[in-house]
Amino acid sequence: MLTFIIGLVILIGGAALYGRFCEKVFGPDDRKTPAYTKEDGVDFVPMKGWKNSLINLLNIAGTGPILGPIQGILFGPIAFLTIPIGNVIGGAMHDYFSGMICLRDGGTQMPEMIRRYSTKGIYKFYNVFVCVLLLLVGAVFIYTPGDIAATQLFGFDGKATSVSTWVIYGVIFLYYLIATVFPIDAIIGKIYPIFGGILLFSAIGIFIGIFVTGMPLMNIWDSWAAPVLSLTGADGTVGTFTYADYFSTKHFLPIFFVTVACGILSGFHSTQTAIISRTMKSERQGRNTFYNMMVLEGFIAMVWAAGAMGVYNLALQEPNAGLATGTVGVVCKYLLGHVGGIIALLGVIVLPITSGDTALRALRLSLSETLHIDQSTNGKRIKLAVPIFALVIAILVFAKTNADGFNILWRYFAWANQTLSLFAFLCITAWMFENGKGKWAWIPMIPGCFYTFICVTYIANAHIGFNIPWTPAYIIGVACAVAYVVACCMYGKKRAAKLLAK
């Protein structure tokens, strides 16, 4: 339990110190924001600070900070330290600078930010990559809340052959269409406070439940070799699960960081902070809206990691049995009882839905900005949304009807999500050099270098990637990480030199 508490102190204390430091480096001021200078009643709409913060939290927090930590905690209590450290210096910093640069540049979406602060080749590649990721996000965030609702809320079997499964998908899909097309304040701004209440109840309820029930949480200095429980394999053999075995055999680097994903860092978040940059009344709201909301997502990840470890150690749920979604229900009902568990499950369902809707909205905005498509009327917005939703349906059908479809979808989603952050780190570095802040370029380059290693090593070894053995995969990862830092420095200094020449 003490390691968990230390992790929370690192998260909260680190955020207070490093968040203020990042704010000082950026230098927010009192200039008029795009919400006023470009107000259109649809996407550029001034909204209150608390509402922007809540909407951003719900936008960025999907199933990642729940399902990721539930699987990531299998590596042991080291997760209680790596999640907060990575969140503070990586994820929250990424969200803050991405959102603030978009805000400072007139409420631009991420493709435009990439165009301004990188090369034409990177810009073109990013446009394709981000569109694919947002489609994957839309599909994943229909699939996961739909299945949790079907199996754990309504008691259906959740199979592809069941009409109930597709009816639930259809309801979520219809909401996504409405939220993608209509004015942000009319739909998202009105319903999100309700969703936020459910989310906060579930997260805080589980957090309190961990202490009230005295869940057995392992410390980093405890013996990781103690058997947690007996497992019966598919072949009938009986074995034991230990955190030590999992840590030593499952390649903590890079698997842990790709698995936990959103609780530490998510490239997807930059597409969401760009949306909120259009509704903020003041630049000075940025730290709370962007940085602190990512820290709050880190708190959610910590809570679910602890809840999962508790039920594993109590042998209430087998770590390797079934989907991580099964552990969600066990944690909720054990800690909060039947009624509280249902409300907590609603919170788990709300999280991905409130990310999926704005993911598809971000895709529409990005396409319209990149291709210069007029979005002034509902009809024109629907016209662009139709092909987007057709592709999401196709991905969803594949994931649901193929035996290994969702596993393939989730792996590509998780890897692409982390990889997308590398584009933002590059542009943040370039922005710093261009704005006379080159001495602070290490802020984005450290996590950028680390995640280049993580993402390249993972895809080099993965069966869904190049299927290269681990040793050469690690070598390739290190080489690419070094090359990333060199490229960032050279490109940043080149931009700074051009600026001085002018």
Sequence positions of predicted segments:
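Extracellular loop-to-transmembrane helix junctions
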Residues: 1-19, 72-102, 111, 341, ...
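Membrane-interface loop-to-helix entry segments
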Residues: 5, 9-27, 129, 145-149, ...
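Selective recognition of specific alpha-helical transmembrane segments in multi-pass small-molecule
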Residues: 7-17, 130, 134-138, 196-214, ...
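Membrane-interface "cap" regions at the ends of multi-pass membrane proteins
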Residues: 10-66, 282-285
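Helix-loop-helix module between adjacent transmembrane segments
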Residues: 10-11, 15, 90-106, 110-180, ...
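Extracellular/periplasmic helix-exit of transmembrane alpha-helices
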Residues: 99, 210-240, 284, 292-330, ...
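Loop-to-transmembrane helix boundary motifs in multi-pass membrane proteins
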Residues: 123-127, 162-170, 292-302, 308-319, ...
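Hydrophobic alpha-helical segments and their helix-loop junctions in multi-pass secondary transporters
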Residues: 138-156, 164-167, 179-180, 199-241, ...
